[in-house]
Amino acid sequence: MSENNQSNQNNQINKIIKSTIEEIEKKFGNESIMLLGQKEKCDVDVFSSGSYAINSALGIGGFPKGRIIEIFGPESSGKTTIALHTIAEIQKKNGFAAFIDVEHSIDPVYAKNLGIDIDNLLISQPDSGEQALEIVDILAKSGSIDLIVVDSVAALVPEAELNGEMKDQSIGLQARLMSKALRKITGSLSKNKTSVIFINQVREKIGVVFGNPETTPGGRALKFYASIRLDVRKSTNIMLNNDISGNQIRVKVVKNKLAPPFKIAETEIIFSKGINKFGEVADLALVHDVLQKKGAWFSYNGNNIAQGRQKLIAQLESNNELFEEIFQKIVEKENQKLS
């Protein structure tokens, strides 16, 4: 085939593709189909998780808009605290959030302590799994909600199980419910840039000798549809004056469709206060060489500023000017890493 014939054939194919795209856009809307390389679709909008360490581990600076996120781990590991901090960050940007309290366990006082405007937080305490996920679907389709948190997947009990007797077998009902709901809401979330955080627990599979015996409720659909999956574990207790004042937690990004996965973030959750942002800044400043450590002393711009980590955190907490200066340098380093 000559070069002219090949060129004419390519032009003809391009015309057909262009005509087909126009037909699809006319029928389903301007954003229904496009080239993957179109810049506006490649740039991922994000919002902060409320933790500098987690934002860094995610590789894109936060959670992605219009996506499904799963935060799972054992009880009292900090899953709900991370989700509540994320709601507070959404509200700081004048966004709207909803909390689907399936467990009926939200603490308004704690939420307020984390910076949430509880007067502007939508909350629902549904009676069944179907009702909870139907509410998520309606909120997603409204286009007015930036973030929906579902706490938790394990508590999404299907109506058939609620209405049945204790002796009735209900194997697979929850998995089928989740699969159907996620198929239904994924398109609305992407179109309206609404994100959903599903908080999940861990269970142990019976009879597993080799490999990881842990699994999460809700079947495989959530693992498949989630763009981000975070595994949250408590590592150690934080002691202050011989009393436990909080927990050190370890967050592993086990799935990430937008950046390299398997990165780990370590942070502290202080009881009644939430994530210790001053401790995170102290740790990240060392990682990015904004602060230097020699022995027990921490130095900044060649000058010793604190002896010991706790005194450094206290210094950052009391000196807002120093905190902002160090934090901005960390942000610059993080932005260089993202670009």
UniProtKB/Swiss-Prot annotation:
Q: Per the record, what is one GO cellular component?
A: cytosol
Location within or outside the cell: Cytoplasm
Q: Which PROSITE patterns match?
A: RECA_1 (PS00321), RECA_2 (PS50162), RECA_3 (PS50163)
Main localisation: cytoplasm
Q: Which UniProt keywords apply?
A: ATP-binding, Cytoplasm, DNA damage, DNA recombination, DNA repair, DNA-binding, Nucleotide-binding, SOS response
A single GO BP: SOS response
**Source domain of life:** Bacteria
For binding ATP, which residues are annotated in this chain's numbering?
G73, P74, E75, S76, S77, G78, K79, T80
Which terms does the record give in the GO molecular function aspect?
Answer: ATP binding; ATP hydrolysis activity; ATP-dependent DNA damage sensor activity; damaged DNA binding; single-stranded DNA binding
Q: Which HAMAP family match?
A: RecA
Q: Which purpose does this protein serve, as stated in its record? A: Can catalyze the hydrolysis of ATP in the presence of single-stranded DNA, the ATP-dependent uptake of single-stranded DNA by duplex DNA, and the ATP-dependent hybridization of homologous single-stranded DNAs. It interacts with LexA causing its activation and leading to its autocatalytic cleavage.
Homology family: Belongs to the RecA family.
Give the protein's recorded name: Protein RecA
Q: What is the lineage of its organism?
A: Bacteria, Bacillati, Mycoplasmatota, Mycoplasmoidales, Metamycoplasmataceae
